[in-house]
Amino acid sequence: MAPYHIRKYQESDRKSVVGLLSGGMAEHAPATFRRLLKLPRTLILLLGGALALLLVSGSWILALVFSLSLLPALWFLAKKPWTRYVDIALRTDMSDITKSYLSECGSCFWVAESEEKVVGTVGALPVDDPTLREKRLQLFHLSVDNEHRGQGIAKALVRTVLQFARDQGYSEVVLDTSNIQLSAMGLYQSLGFKKTGQSFFHVWARLVDLHTVHFIYHLPSAQAGRL
C-alpha cells in the first residue's frame, strides 16, 4: 500500500481532477442500467412490447429483435444522468476550481496524492441560503481512483472537510450522493452523517429512478477536540 498525503488543489492538478470526476461518474452507469432493467415499467416495455409483437406477427425472432433493439436506448438513459452531472459541474464550480474553491477562506478543494499522482479529490463550499439558522458547508466531488480504494483515502478526505468546517466555524456539513452509491452512503453513515431525505437531480434521473440522497453532519462544539 503506497503512502498518500492530502494537500490543497493546484492548477497543475486540473487534468487529473477532471479525469477522476468523469471516470468516477461513468463507473455508476452499469449499476444504473441494471436498476433500470428491473423497474416494472421497463419490464412492461421489454416483455409486453415483445409479447404484443409476437401476437401480431407470430414471429419469436421479431419479438426478440424488438427487445434487444431497446437495450442501447436503455443504456443511453442509464448513462445520461452521470454525463449530465459532469457537464453541469464542468460549466459551473469545476470550470475554474481555483476561483470557485480557493478564492475565499470559507471554501477549499483538496487532492490526495500518492507517488506524485492525484488519486483522490474533495471540495467544500459554503451553502448560500439566508433562511438557514446555522452556518452550513457543503461537501462536493468526493472521488478516489479505483486502484487506490480500500486504503482509507475517502474517509481521510471527508475528515479533512469536517475538520475544515470546524476550524471555519461551521455548524453543519451537508452532502448529496445517490441511491446507487451504496459504499459512499455506508462511508458517510459510518462517519456520523444522517440521511435527511431524497430527491431527483434531473428529469434524466427520474427516468431511471436515480435518487439524490441528502446527508447532514452536525458538528460538535470546537471545545470537543479535533476529529
UniProtKB/Swiss-Prot annotation:
Description of activity control: Allosterically regulated by acetylation at residue Lys-99.
* Lumenal face residues: 64-227
Q: Which PROSITE patterns match?
A: GNAT
Expression triggers:
Up-regulated by ceramides. Up-regulated in the brain of Alzheimer's disease patients.
- EC number(s) from the headed UniProt entry: 2.3.1.-
Instruction: Share an example GO biological-process annotation for this protein.
Output: gastrulation with mouth forming second
Q: How is it modified after translation?
A: Acetylation on Lys-99 modulates enzymatic activity.
Q: Does the keyword Transmembrane helix apply?
A: yes
The catalytic activity, as recorded, is: L-lysyl-[protein] + acetyl-CoA = N(6)-acetyl-L-lysyl-[protein] + CoA + H(+)
Entry-annotated residues carrying N6-acetyllysine = 99
| Domain N-acetyltransferase residue range list | 61-214
Main localization is endoplasmic reticulum
Q: Which Pfam families match?
A: Acetyltransf_1 (PF00583)
Q: Give the UniProt subcellular location, in the record's own words.
A: Endoplasmic reticulum-Golgi intermediate compartment membrane; Endoplasmic reticulum membrane
Q: Where are the transmembrane segments?
A: 43-63
Q: Report one GO cellular component.
A: membrane
Q: How does it sit in the membrane?
A: Single-pass type II membrane protein
Enumerate the UniProt keywords alphabetically: Acetylation, Acyltransferase, Endoplasmic reticulum, Membrane, Signal-anchor, Transferase, Transmembrane, Transmembrane helix
Q: Which residues does the entry place in the Cytoplasmic compartment?
A: 1-42
Listed GO molecular functions? Answer: L-lysine N-acetyltransferase activity, acting on acetyl phosphate as donor; N-acetyltransferase activity; protein-lysine-acetyltransferase activity
**Coiled coil ranges:** none
| Family to which the UniProt record says this protein belongs | Belongs to the NAT8 family.
> What is this protein's function?
Endoplasmic reticulum (ER)-membrane-bound lysine N-acetyltransferase catalyzing the N6-acetylation of lysine residues in the lumen of the ER in various proteins, including PROM1 and BACE1, using acetyl-CoA as acetyl donor. Thereby, may regulate apoptosis through the acetylation and the regulation of the expression of PROM1. Acetylates and stabilizes BACE1 immature protein, leading to increased steady-state levels in neurons. By acting on BACE1 expression, may regulate amyloid beta-peptide formation. N(6)-lysine acetylation in ER maintains protein homeostasis and regulates reticulophagy.
Query: What is this protein called in UniProt?
Result: N-acetyltransferase 8B
Can you name the source organism?
Homo sapiens
Query: What gene does this protein come from?
Result: NAT8B
